[in-house]
Regions:
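Accessory "access/gating" subregions that flank catalytic or transport cores
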Residues: 127-176
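Acidic, glycine-rich active-site loops and adjacent beta-strand->loop/helix elements
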Residues: 17-26, 188-190, 231-234
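A conserved FAD-binding loop/helix module that cradles the flavin
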Residues: 1-8, 131, 191-217
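Short, small/polar residue-rich loop motifs at catalytic or cofactor-binding pockets
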Residues: 42, 163-165, 199
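Long, amphipathic alpha-helical stalk/connector segments used for oligomerization, subunit docking
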Residues: 220-235
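An anion/pyrophosphate-binding glycine-rich loop and adjacent beta-alpha core
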Residues: 10-145, 216-219
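Short FAD-binding loop at a beta-strand-to-alpha-helix junction that anchors the flavin cofactor
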Residues: 174-198
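General beta-strand structural signal in soluble alpha/beta enzymes
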Residues: 12-17, 154, 171, 184-185
Length: 235
């Protein structure tokens, strides 16, 4: 719909701004051609880590070691180490950049080298498996179907992927595009996020545009429109 509007003359704004999502399933197997999006809610309880040493990471990538073989002191919970105030809930761009950095250092754990662990072991010990299952069972099932690993028993592997473009149809403060009378709200417009969108903003944008802004602005626009003449000739 946005592209159709663009073809009719509507302006596009900020097409270069792209959001990266840090919690995706890395490419694996013969049929998964791209990373698969997971929910950011997983980072509420999962702890993100990679091995401290490149040698341990290489052993995991080649199948000579498993994550359970890495002792606690040989694990780098890098978000907790670098950002103690946020820990594993650091903003998306920071978490994504940090994951790429440790993988670029040679400490990635996926077969491709592009993956880090999201580990629920401590949360399961603290809260119990039933609580974790009640929160994430659908996500865990999806992960297991794709990867073949049981995340209740072994850490998930995750890696950042392109998620969202902040760009969209240009709108003014009344949410009207450059085509008079064509209004655009929610994720289809460009207006709210700048160069980076914070997590959990999609619902907020839809509510703000659709509930608070558009009912007033579109009513004002329609109130200013004068009806044209009506042809009453039925012949």
């Amino acid at each position: 719909a946005a592209f159709k509007a663009y073809k009719r003359g509507a302006y596009i704004a900020n097409p270069c701004y792209t959001q990266i999502h840090p919690t995706c399933i890395p490419v694996s197997g013969d049929y998964q051609s791209k990373l698969t999006l997971m929910s950011e809610s997983l980072r509420n309880d999962g702890r993100i880590w990679v091995p401290v040493s490149k040698e341990d990471a290489e052993a995991i990538r080649t199948g000579n070691k498993h994550p359970e073989d890495i002792a606690e002191e040989d694990r780098d919970y890098y978000l907790e180490r670098k950002y103690p105030s946020f820990g594993n809930l650091a903003p998306r761009d920071i978490s994504s950049r940090a994951a790429k950095e440790v993988c670029d250092e040679g400490r990635g754990v996926a077969p491709t080298g592009l993956g880090v662990y999201l580990d629920f072991k401590d949360a399961i010990e603290r809260l119990g498996e039933d609580v974790i299952r009640s929160r994430y069972s659908n996500l865990f099932q999806m992960y297991e179907k794709i990867s073949g690993d049981n995340p209740y028993k072994t850490p998930m592997q995750i890696f950042p992927a392109v998620h969202y473009t902040m760009g969209g149809l240009w709108v003014d403060y009344n949410l009207q595009t450059s085509i008079p009378g064509l209004h655009c709200l929610g994720e289809a417009n460009f207006s709210d996020h700048g160069a980076n969108r914070l997590g959990a903003s999609a619902l907020m944008q839809g509510l703000a545009d659709g509930y608070f802004v558009l009912p007033t602005t579109i009513a004002n626009y329609l109130a200013d429109q004068k009806p044209g003449s009506i042809n009453t000739d039925m012949d």
